[in-house]
């Protein structure tokens, strides 16, 4: 079952289906839970991204393999499927017949394995992927670089308390064929704030795309009129442009959360230039731009929000070397690190009492100015013992 006409959450057979389901925050569920528990209410974590690596040239293109390696380093592992016939520690099944798809996880690689080590098909390329298998009889093995890999995904999760709500319309495991036919580069979803008792804060936007190496622009609008969408009739709250190296489902965190009022209607527009936005097979208040905004099948655009942040902890980098910190009470430690190429260069610590004032502007020492290729991370800790639920990590 892969569409909204049945229970599509039972869809199986590939990591692409898993990515679509996990992006709705159904699962993952810890192994000590019963197999039939509700995946949404028992999710151990929330998925932010499920990026897709193009595997069609991995068996013949060194540059494609380097891109795969970067994904493994960034996300820790990638899932994939290949045609499997037998078990072998150095395996190359590329010329075997009677094989069937088998899903595994790649956790590393070794470029120095001699080609002649791989069995049974002949191999001319040295090196292979280190695979974590699901078979206890062969828990780990090396798969030749010359093997064709499919449905390659890396999943990135966050703690459950980072977001409270996930707004979306797409509810199918498979993409709509119309999306691939039209190759939509601009799309929008319009949502009404779910809660009627408190405001919410939009913190991130997720989008499903086919393609890679693309610029992606996200725009958030408030004061949207019910029943239609036209950016000219709404208020632009924020915009952010990022570069996406991989396809699949990417999460774009906003530089500053956008407050949306209870009961109000908001919209999110996504634009890409070297890819296209995917659609699902069901309906929603979605729009695509083709010379004008027209209603469409549900686009795979999701919005992650946090309930009213007035009582939450948050950190915001400002200009002129300042940081705005909001706390929900008590004494907390603000820690800011400066790094270059993942190497720690400097750090700053300040103790802040939020009992008297819930918000404070912290001015950093001289030298803490915007520098190209320098990454800043900010954390809010409770007395160095427990990390705050709203720990922020923001590029500045």
Q: What residues fall within each predicted segment?
A:
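Aromatic- and Gly/Pro-enriched, solvent-exposed loop/edge beta-strand patches characteristic
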Residues: 213-286
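Short strand-edge motifs at loop-to-beta-strand transitions and within beta-strands
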Residues: 248-250, 358-362
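Short, aromatic- and glycine-rich surface loops/edge beta-strands on solvent-exposed regions
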Residues: 266-270, 370-385
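Beta-strand signatures of extracellular beta-sandwich domains
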Residues: 217-221, 333-338, 377-379
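Structural beta-strand segments of beta-rich domains
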Residues: 201-203, 319-323
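Predominantly the structural core of cysteine protease catalytic domains
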Residues: 1-128, 132-212, 243-247, 261-263
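Short acidic/polar inter-strand loop motif in beta-rich domains
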Residues: 272-279, 382-391
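PGST-rich, cysteine-poor low-complexity/disordered linker and tail segments that act as flexible spacers
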Residues: 280-312
């Amino acid at each position: 079952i892969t569409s909204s006409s049945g229970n599509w959450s039972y869809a199986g057979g590939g990591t692409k289906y898993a990515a679509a389901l996990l992006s709705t925050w159904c699962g993952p569920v810890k192994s000590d839970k019963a197999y039939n528990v509700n995946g949404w209410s028992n999710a151990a974590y929330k998925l932010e991204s499920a990026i897709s690596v193009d595997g069609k040239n991995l068996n013949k293109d060194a540059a494609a393999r380097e891109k795969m390696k970067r994904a493994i380093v960034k996300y820790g592992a990638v899932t994939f499927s290949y045609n499997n016939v037998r078990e072998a520690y150095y395996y190359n099944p590329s010329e075997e017949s009677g094989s069937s798809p088998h899903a595994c996880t790649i956790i590393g690689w070794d470029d120095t394995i001699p080609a002649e080590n791989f069995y049974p098909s002949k191999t001319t390329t040295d090196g292979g992927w280190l695979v974590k298998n699901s078979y206890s009889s062969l828990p780990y093995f090396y798969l030749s670089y010359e093997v064709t890999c499919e449905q390659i995904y890396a999943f990135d999760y966050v703690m459950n308390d980072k977001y409270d709500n996930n707004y979306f319309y797409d509810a199918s495991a498979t993409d709509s064929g119309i999306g691939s036919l039209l190759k939509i580069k601009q799309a929008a979803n319009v949502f009404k704030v779910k809660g009627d008792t408190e405001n919410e804060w939009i913190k991130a936007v997720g989008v499903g795309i086919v393609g890679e190496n693309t610029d992606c622009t996200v725009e958030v609008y408030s004061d949207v009129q019910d029943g239609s969408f036209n950016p000219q009739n709404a208020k632009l709250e924020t915009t952010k442009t990022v570069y996406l190296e991989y396809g699949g489902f990417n999460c774009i965190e906003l530089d500053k959360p956008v407050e949306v009022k209870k009961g109000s209607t908001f919209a999110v527009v996504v634009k890409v230039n070297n890819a296209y936005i995917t659609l699902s097979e069901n309906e929603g208040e979605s729009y695509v731009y083709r010379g004008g905004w027209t209603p469409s099948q549900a686009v795979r655009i999701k919005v992650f929000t946090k309930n009213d942040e007035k009582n939450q902890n948050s950190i915001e980098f400002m200009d002129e070397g300042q940081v705005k910190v909001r706390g929900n009470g008590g004494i907390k430690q603000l820690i800011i690190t400066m790094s270059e190429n993942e190497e720690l260069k400097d750090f700053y610590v300040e103790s802040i009492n939020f009992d008297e004032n819930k918000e404070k502007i912290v001015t950093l020492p001289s030298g803490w100015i915007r520098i190209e290729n320098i990454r800043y991370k900010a954390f809010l800790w409770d007395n160095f013992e427990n990390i705050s639920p709203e720990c922020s990590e923001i590029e500045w």
